[in-house]
């Protein structure tokens, strides 16, 4: 109460901040006459002037007022549109490393041109990030006219581009692209073998459009580059037949309650757990089929992989429903449906064997599992930028998360014109059937007066169910869901047309404005090549229809179910009432809806019982709306905790990733790594000697024979260490260490002299990079295994996060030691007699790189989701010749086994 009183007197932080920016906007407005007086050439020349002023030491803040005035005037000349004062304020918020919440239709795309221009003047590059290729292409094409008029270059970074095309895109002053593509390019650059293979510049400034979608909804979905592993698809098929033999139990076993089912389903946390009875039943079935040894448990160390497959099959059958979480295409592919947008995600795959389990369940071809080669979460990728900003229509409900995780403050920008949309209260019915019938009954009279209607559903299944009801009621409508992805923008653009009814899955079509009366440009395009008179007639017709739609009450939004997040509901409502237009919205709910059933059922159902509701009756009361909102807050809090927990774990691997990538880039960018190799050489041989001749030890503790054998076996260094001890009775361990290192170095230096420092230097870099990549890949797999079982430490009264940090650090230190040793082993054993043979080895390495089969993936941790854009991946490598076995003779003709020769380089 006191806080509210103080806010009323001095205003909120948001109000005070906006008040300060309004003063700056007034200064920009004062420059308008001056800018209008300039010719096109004089206005363009301002860009060169600003760059010179920055080069001489002026800050961006000093030139902001003038730069914004230049962009505003250029926008008017190029587009015939000028930024409103609220858009100037939005631009300043973005420049100030904050999130601008701007309502739908307030011109976020035009707002972003202001800070993009200002920050591009530094020459370090600006990235404008959107959620899909369509929006990236559309915005780049449109805004390029403005930026090129002002003398700046624009690039576009989308899937399927070559390395040269991407380098050109990143070299531009302003680059548009998707979050996936920027993230994958970062990972690919850090897997490159040569500096010229990289495509990106430094990560300077990013503006994220629909920032809530990317930094919140996709925060749990790391980007992964992976390669195939040797998996057995038959196990998935076998286990798929086991699950139908199990029965579900309503709740978990406790001391007081022992059920008769085999597994329980926790819808709230999206988990399935075998009961003790179920575990025993599954073990018996698996033992009968020869998949599990007798007297062995599913939970024994040797059966962990089998348990992993059983859990995946259980989840596939109980938590993942066809036409809700995924669809099956005509080609027999299981394609994931994005739970937030309702779009299909071709090429993306769930991880942890879940996708294979779903494929087995649907009876389609089962693809192999993959091994992670490189990964990063969006949370950690975007925190790499020096400056980061974002814009969206719905950020305020997630302001705390933006601030605590990304350090981004959310500023709510006022609308240019007052919002007059009427938001009706929630109507709650007992059953889904009653709810859908009520929606159809509500739509009929509104259609008679020509009011356009947009119906939002949560799944493909529900959109098709509602579509069938409308067909029976003879209501003409369009359906937009994951199955009609290509028509998305067109359908949404015409959703505001007179008398149109559109059913859309969740927030499909986000980023496309719904104009009352329909999209005029699209209507004119359909006319084709017609006379100016016909074009004018079409425009007049559109104006008439626009007036009728306004009179009918504007766009009516119908929500068929509350989402887990209030923000998603607000996004749906936000499609109506743009730029001061009239509009209406209402949510229809039932006690059978997921959110109501799982989170809000008890309170609301008790309320409905007290009211004595009958079939077909609905309840509308502020108490009900409050109960639903409280349920949503609970879910939002739980989801935030999950994302925060993910970040805590990923921060551990993120620090390790930085070290590895820094090492790789240091190797690539150095002309030679002689000093690094010498240091590694000293460390490895010192450690080797210390194992057999411990420091400050007695002669009796020495194992000189073991040292000789180790030096010869691992490094091909044949030294008479025992003879040294016989020849010199006073020989100290320090002297042994020095002599071993000296002889080993001399042997390697002789090899370098033989082929020349340039060739061996290039070879050293190649060995170093390939060894880093191999061990990093193995380390990522070890980290995955560690993480999957770390929660069990809680039962031993230990903090799983602290244990994960400690053990992963130990694994990392061990990996760094292994890296040094592996490099020295390979360099010691390699036999290069001539320049020609060195060239052969280099060529083999290049061929290996060319054949590398990589898949870009995007994995959702809470559901085990992995995503791969099939347009970005290389074609699958098919081996034409027999693979060389590790113990077979090396094909180079050296006479050695493959694993001891060129197999070391694989």
From Swiss-Prot:
Cofactor binding: number and manner: May bind 1 zinc ion per subunit.
Catalytic activities: ATP + H2O + cellular proteinSide 1 = ADP + phosphate + cellular proteinSide 2
Record's subcellular location: Cell inner membrane; Cytoplasm
Bias-annotated ranges (Basic and acidic residues): 876-886
Keyword Protein transport: yes
GO cellular component, one term: cytosol
Region (Disordered): 860-906
SUBUNIT field: Monomer and homodimer. Part of the essential Sec protein translocation apparatus which comprises SecA, SecYEG and auxiliary proteins SecDF-YajC and YidC.
Protein name: Protein translocase subunit SecA
Organism (species): Psychromonas ingrahamii (strain DSM 17664 / CCUG 51855 / 37)
């Amino acid at each position: 109460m006191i806080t509210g009183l103080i806010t009323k007197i001095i205003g909120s932080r948001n109000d005070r901040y906006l008040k300060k920016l309004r003063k700056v906007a007034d200064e920009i407005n004062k420059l308008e006459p001056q800018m209008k007086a300039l010719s096109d050439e004089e206005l363009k020349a301002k860009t060169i002037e600003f760059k010179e002023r920055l080069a001489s030491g002026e800050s961006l803040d000093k030139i902001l007022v003038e730069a914004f005035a230049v962009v505003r005037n250029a926008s008017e000349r190029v587009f015939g549109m000028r930024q409103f004062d609220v858009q100037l304020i939005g631009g300043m918020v973005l420049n100030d490393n904050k999130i601008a919440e701007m309502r739908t239709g307030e011109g976020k795309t035009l707002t972003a041109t202001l800070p993009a221009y200002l920050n591009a003047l530094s020459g370090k590059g600006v990235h404008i990030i959107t959620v899909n290729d369509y929006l990236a292409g559309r915005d780049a094409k449109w805004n390029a006219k403005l930026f090129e008029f002002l003398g700046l270059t624009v690039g576009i970074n989308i899937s399927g581009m070559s390395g040269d095309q991407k380098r050109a895109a990143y070299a531009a002053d302003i680059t548009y692209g998707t979050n996936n593509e920027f993230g994958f390019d970062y990972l690919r650059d850090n897997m490159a073998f040569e500096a010229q293979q990289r495509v990106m510049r430094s990560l300077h400034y990013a503006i994220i459009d629909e920032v809530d979608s990317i930094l919140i909804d996709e925060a749990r979905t790391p980007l992964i580059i992976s390669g195939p592993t040797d998996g057995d698809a038959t196990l998935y098929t076998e286990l798929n037949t086991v699950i139908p033999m199990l029965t579900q139990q309503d709740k978990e076993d406790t001391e007081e309650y022992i059920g008769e089912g085999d597994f329980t389903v926790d819808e709230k946390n999206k988990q399935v757990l075998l009961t003790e009875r179920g575990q025993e039943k599954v073990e018996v079935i698996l033992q009968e089929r020869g998949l599990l040894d007798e007297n062995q448990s599913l939970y024994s160390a040797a059966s962990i992989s089998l348990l992993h497959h059983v859990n995946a099959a259980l989840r596939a059958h109980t938590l993942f429903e066809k036409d809700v979480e995924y669809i099956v295409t005509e080609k027999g592919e299981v394609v994931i449906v994005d739970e937030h947008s309702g779009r299909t995600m071709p090429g993306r795959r769930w991880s942890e064997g879940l996708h294979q389990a779903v494929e087995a369940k649907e009876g389609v071809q089962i693809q192999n599992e993959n091994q992670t080669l490189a990964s990063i979460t969006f949370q950690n990728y975007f925190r790499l930028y020096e400056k980061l900003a974002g814009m969206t229509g719905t950020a305020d409900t997630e302001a705390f998360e933006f601030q605590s995780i990304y350090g981004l403050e959310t500023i709510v920008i006022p609308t240019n014109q007052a919002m007059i949309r009427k938001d009706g209260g929630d109507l709650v019915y007992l059953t889904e059937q009653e709810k859908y019938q009520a929606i159809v009954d509500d739509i009929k009279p509104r259609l008679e007066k020509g009011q356009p209607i947009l119906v939002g559903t949560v799944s493909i299944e529900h959109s098709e169910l509602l579509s069938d009801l409308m067909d029976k009621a003879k209501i003409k409508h369009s359906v937009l869901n994951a199955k009609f992805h290509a028509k998305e923008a067109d359908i949404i653009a015409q959703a505001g047309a007179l008398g149109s009814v559109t059913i859309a899955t969740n927030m499909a079509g986000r980023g496309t404005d719904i104009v009352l009366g329909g999209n005029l440009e699209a209507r004119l395009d359909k006319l084709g090549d017609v006379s100016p008179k016909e074009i004018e007639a079409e425009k007049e017709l559109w104006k008439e229809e626009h007036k009728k739609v306004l009179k009918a009450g504007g766009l009516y939004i119908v929500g068929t179910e509350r989402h887990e997040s209030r923000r998603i509901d607000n996004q749906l409502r936000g499609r109506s009432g743009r730029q001061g237009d009239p509009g209406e919205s209402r949510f229809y709910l039932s006690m059978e809806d997921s959110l109501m059933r799982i989170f809000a059922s008890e309170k609301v159902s008790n309320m409905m019982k007290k009211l004595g509701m009958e079939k077909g009756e609905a309840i509308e009361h502020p108490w009900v709306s409050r109960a639903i909102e409280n349920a949503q807050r609970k879910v939002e809090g739980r989801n935030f905790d999950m994302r925060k927990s993910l970040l805590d774990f990923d921060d551990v691997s993120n620090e390790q990733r930085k070290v590895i990538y820094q090492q790789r880039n240091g190797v690539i960018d150095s002309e030679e790594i002689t000093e690094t190799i010498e240091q590694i050489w000293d460390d490895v041989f010192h450690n080797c000697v210390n194992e057999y001749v411990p420091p400050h030890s007695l002669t009796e503790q020495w194992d000189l024979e073991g040292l000789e054998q180790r030096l010869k076996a691992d490094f091909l260094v044949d030294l008479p260490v025992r003879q040294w001890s016989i020849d010199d009775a006073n020989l100290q361990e320090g002297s042994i260490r020095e002599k071993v290192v000296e002889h080993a170095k001399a042997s390697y230096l002789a090899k370098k002299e033989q082929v020349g420092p340039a060739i061996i230097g290039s070879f050293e870099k190649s060995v170093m990079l390939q060894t880093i990549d191999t061990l990093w890949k193995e380390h990522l797999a070890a980290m995955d295994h560690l993480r999957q079982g770390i929660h069990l430490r809680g039962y031993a009264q230990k903090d799983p996060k602290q244990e994960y940090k400690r053990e992963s650090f130990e694994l990392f230190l061990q990996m760094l030691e292994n890296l040094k040793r592996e490099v020295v082993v390979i360099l010691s054993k390699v036999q290069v007699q001539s320049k020609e043979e060195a060239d052969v080895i280099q060529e083999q390495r290049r061929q290996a790189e060319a054949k590398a089969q990589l898949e870009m993936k995007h994995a959702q941790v809470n559901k085990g989701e992995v995503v791969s854009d099939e347009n970005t991946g290389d074609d699958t490598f098919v081996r034409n010749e027999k693979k060389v076995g590790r113990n077979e003779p090396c094909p180079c003709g050296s006479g050695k086994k493959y694993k001891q020769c060129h197999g070391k380089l694989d």
